[in-house]
């Protein structure tokens, strides 16, 4: 069976999204999917809503990381986004590093991207590109949805949320299930309690 094209929309600060990204990477590495890495913003999603104080700095810093990712996208497309997101996510979600400008700059270097990508955290003109990507994620779902959004077979879905990220045969089985569900126009939701980290 040929690899299934997938668009993976993500906010880099979301720990659940990070786990799902590791799953879809496993699926792609096995040859079952080709992934186009795209951006979305929980900051844009929550505009006009009261954000608790403990999350505000994360949302602000997430916006700065998204600018760097938008610059990476302009520089080298989906492949550059994938490399930078992997470097950012490993630092933030695996090593517990702060999501600050120094960590972003280190991730940019690790991803083999030019320093201009790290400097893009201050480029407010990139906010329009982030917003356009976010709007594409919401259009794929057809409603408002958080991160991640996975689009395949002409449909977008929030999730799947996977903790921990499945590997090997389980990763492929889950992907096949998602692919099959995407082909059922009547399907809209399936949910259970989230696993703890």
Which residues does each predicted region cover?
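Extreme N-terminal starter segment of soluble prokaryotic enzymes
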Residues: 2-7
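Structural alpha/beta surface segment adjacent to cysteine/selenocysteine redox centers
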Residues: 12, 18-105, 177-181, 189-193, ...
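C-terminal cap of thioredoxin/glutaredoxin-like
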Residues: 23-27, 101-197
């Amino acid at each position: 069976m040929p690899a299934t094209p997938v668009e993976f929309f993500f906010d880099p600060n979301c720990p659940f999204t990070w786990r799902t990204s590791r799953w879809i990477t496993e699926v792609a590495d096995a040859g079952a999917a080709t992934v186009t890495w795209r951006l979305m913003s929980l900051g844009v999603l929550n505009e006009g809503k009261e954000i608790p104080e403990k999350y505000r700095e994360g949302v602000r810093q997430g916006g700065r990381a998204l600018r760097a990712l938008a610059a990476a996208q302009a520089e080298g497309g989906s492949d550059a986004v994938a490399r930078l997101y992997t470097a950012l996510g490993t630092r933030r979600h695996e090593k517990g590093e702060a999501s600050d400008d120094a960590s972003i700059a280190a991730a940019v270097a690790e991803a083999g991207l030019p320093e201009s990508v790290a400097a893009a955290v201050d480029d407010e003109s990139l906010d329009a590109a982030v917003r356009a990507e976010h709007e594409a994620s919401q259009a794929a779902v057809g409603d408002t949805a958080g991160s991640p959004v996975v689009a395949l077979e002409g449909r977008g879905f929030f999730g799947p949320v996977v903790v921990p990220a499945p590997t090997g045969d389980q990763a492929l089985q889950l992907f096949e299930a998602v692919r099959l569900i995407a082909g059922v126009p009547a399907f809209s939701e399936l949910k259970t309690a989230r696993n703890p980290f």
